[in-house]
Amino acid sequence: LCPQSKPMGGFARTSPSYETPYKADDAMGKNGWGEGYTFPCLFRNGDKGWILISETGVDSKYCGSRLLGHENGLYTIGFPQEGEMNGNGTTAPGLALPGETPWRTVTLGETLAPIVETTVSFDVVKPLYEASGKYEYGRGSWSWIIGMDGSTKYEEQLRYIDFSAAMGYQSVLVDALWDTQIGYDKVEKLAKYGAEKGVGLYLWYNSNGYWNDAPQSPRGIMDNAIARRKEMKWMQSIGIRGIKVDFFGGDKQVTMQ
């Protein structure tokens, strides 16, 4: 189980950020750090097997939820905390009738195989739109996990493109600060170099509007429709494979919107 953290804490007030440590083999009847647990939640039913409880199909018509623990092994659905999104937005969703909630799924398995292999989170959800092509993530490399912000440099990303190509990987994730430490012009060169080797690029973006203090850039783009469309057009023109958006402000409906 992954405890839900209190809002507006941690690095640059970015919590709850779904980065708290998992607690293995914890006792029933607890409530994490007092705020419940983040989905998905995995339970072991003695020697009988495993139970995975999760949520899927959350969109702008509702909010994301968490699992609240009570005494005697009772767990209930909980709405977002009031302080999320810097206090902006309501904790309860506004839902027009007729309406529907997101799916809450329960997956059972005598072993962990059905838990790992289940596709129920995709099976019950209808696509919101028809994709313009067949998209596959594949395998990739990522310099930040070792070198952090300082590794987002042109020469280092060239090295990671070469590494991905040598390993037969399909991509490289270029993380935070690429806009200032590499620059848009050189990102285009990286994308072209990667394409020649069969390696696509993912670019990192800060989700920030007003909901936390995380300074890493690019920021002020993904929360603005006009800026976002312009950026997407540029990425499409140079063959960027996808994006990683970081520092979401919480699970309120305003975030989903």
For each feature predicted by the language model, list its residue ranges.
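Aromatic- and carboxylate-enriched substrate-binding clefts and catalytic-loop regions
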Residues: 176-257
